[in-house]
C-alpha cells in the first residue's frame, strides 16, 4: 500500500488544482481513446460497484471505464451482498476493501458512505448520495472545458435543492465562478452545505446566490442547468411537486433571459414537459449527450488520479 489514501466523497475535500488535474487526465484519456490508443493504467485492478440506488449512467460508465483502463468491475446490489441484509457497514467495508482495489458506492444517506470510507483500505468513490453527486460535476465541468466555456462562468441552477445543487455549489466555491440557485420555497438547498460553500467561496472569490425566483437566477447566465423534480425515494411526492414546481420548467422563454450563447446542461434522465421543455432539450441535445458520455471519461480520470495518489 502506498503512502496516501484518498477518497472521493465530495468536492469539498479537493483543491481547485486537484479538480482541474482530474479533469485534464480525463480529457487526455478521452483523446487517446478517440485516436484508438488505450493505456491500461489500472491493469488487473478490480472496482467493486455497490448499488443501493439503481442507475443507468453510473453503472455503464464505471463498468466500461474500468474495462477500458485494463481492469475489471464487479456489480453488487443489495441482493448480492449482506450490506442490504443487516451486516454492519464497517464489516462490509473491511471485507470488500481487502479483496478489491477501489470501491464505488451509490446509496442514500451520505453518512453511510462516510462510514464505509472510514473503514476502507482502498479509495471509495461517491457514485451518488442524497446529499452529493460529485462525479456528475466532474463530467459537467469537463464538458464546459471542451466547449470553451470554462472562463467567466455564470451558472444558473433551476429546480430542486438536491444533491446536484449541493455539488454545483461546491464546484463553484472551489473553482471560483458565479452560481445562482433558484428553488421553490420549502425546497431550498441544505443550509449547512450552503454555509460551507459560502465559506469556501470567500477564499476563492466565487459568488453563490440563492433565490426563489428563476428569472433572477437565469438572467445573463452562460450555463443553465436543472435536474428531476422528484428524486429516487420521493415518488409519493411526485404529484405535489409537479404543482409546487410550476414555473420552474426551463423552457424557451426562460432560456431567452440567459446570455445569447448560453448552454443548457442536464445530468439525465430528463423528464420533458416537467423540469425542461422538449424544445430546449432537443436544441441542446448535442452538449447534453456529450455531457453524459463525459461521465465515462471524467470517472476514468478520477480513478487513475486516485490510484496515483497511493503511489506518491
Curated annotation (Swiss-Prot):
Binding site for carbamoyl phosphate: 55-58, 106, 133-136, 267-268, 295
GO molecular function: amino acid binding; ornithine carbamoyltransferase activity
Pathway participation: Amino-acid biosynthesis; L-arginine biosynthesis; L-arginine from L-ornithine and carbamoyl phosphate: step 1/3
Swiss-Prot/TrEMBL GO biological process terms: arginine biosynthetic process via ornithine; citrulline biosynthetic process; L-arginine biosynthetic process
Cellular compartments annotated: Cytoplasm
UniProt: L-ornithine binding residues: 163, 227, 231-232
Enzyme category, top tier: transferase
Main localisation: cytoplasm
Keyword terms: Amino-acid biosynthesis, Arginine biosynthesis, Cytoplasm, Transferase
Enzyme Commission code: 2.1.3.3
Gene Ontology CC, one term: cytoplasm
Reaction catalysed by this enzyme: carbamoyl phosphate + L-ornithine = L-citrulline + phosphate + H(+)
HAMAP family assigned to the protein according to its UniProt record, in alphabetical order: OTCase
Family: Belongs to the aspartate/ornithine carbamoyltransferase superfamily. OTCase family.
Record-given protein name: Ornithine carbamoyltransferase
Organism: Sulfurimonas denitrificans (strain ATCC 33889 / DSM 1251) (Thiomicrospira denitrificans (strain ATCC 33889 / DSM 1251))
Amino acid at each position: 500500500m502506498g503512502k496516501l489514501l484518498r477518497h472521493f466523497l465530495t468536492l469539498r475535500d479537493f483543491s481547485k488544482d486537484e479538480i482541474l488535474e482530474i479533469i485534464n487526465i480525463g480529457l487526455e484519456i478521452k483523446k487517446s481513446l478517440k485516436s484508438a490508443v488505450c493505456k491500461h493504467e489500472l491493469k488487473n485492478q478490480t472496482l467493486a460497484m455497490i448499488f443501493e440506488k439503481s442507475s443507468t449512467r453510473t453503472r455503464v460508465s464505471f463498468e466500461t471505464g474500468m474495462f477500458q483502463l485494463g481492469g475489471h468491475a464487479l456489480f453488487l446490489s443489495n441482493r448480492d451482498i449482506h450490506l442490504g441484509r443487516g451486516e454492519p457497514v464497517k464489516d462490509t467495508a473491511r471485507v470488500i476493501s481487502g479483496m478489491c482495489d477501489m470501491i464505488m458506492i451509490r446509496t442514500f444517506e451520505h453518512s453511510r458512505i462516510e462510514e464505509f470510507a472510514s473503514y476502507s483500505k482502498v479509495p471509495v468513490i461517491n457514485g451518488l448520495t442524497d446529499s452529493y453527486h460529485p462525479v456528475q460535476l466532474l463530467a459537467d465541468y469537463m464538458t464546459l472545458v471542451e466547449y470553451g466555456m470554462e472562463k467567466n462562468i455564470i451558472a444558473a441552477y433551476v429546480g430542486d435543492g438536491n444533491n446536484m445543487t449541493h455539488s454545483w455549489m461546491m464546484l463553484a466555491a472551489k473553482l471560483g465562478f458565479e452560481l445562482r440557485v433558484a428553488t421553490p420555497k420549502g425546497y431550498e438547498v441544505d443550509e449547512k452545505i450552503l454555509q460551507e460553500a459560502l465559506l469556501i467561496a470567500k477564499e476563492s472569490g466565487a459568488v453563490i446566490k440563492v433565490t426563489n425566483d428563476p428569472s433572477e437566477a437565469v438572467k445573463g447566465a452562460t450555463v443553465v442547468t436543472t435536474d428531476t423534480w422528484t428524486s429516487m425515494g420521493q415518488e409519493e411526492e411526485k404529484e405535489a411537486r409537479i404543482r409546487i414546481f410550476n414555473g420552474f420548467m426551463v423552457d424557451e422563454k426562460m432560456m431567452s433571459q440567459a446570455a445569447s450563447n448560453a448552454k443548457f446542461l442536464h445530468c439525465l434522465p430528463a423528464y420533458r414537459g416537467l423540469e425542461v421543455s422538449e424544445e430546449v432539450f432537443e436544441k441542446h441535445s448535442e452538449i447534453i449527450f456529450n455531457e453524459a458520455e463525459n461521465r465515462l471519461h471524467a470517472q476514468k480520470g478520477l480513478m487513475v488520479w486516485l490510484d496515483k495518489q497511493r503511489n506518491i
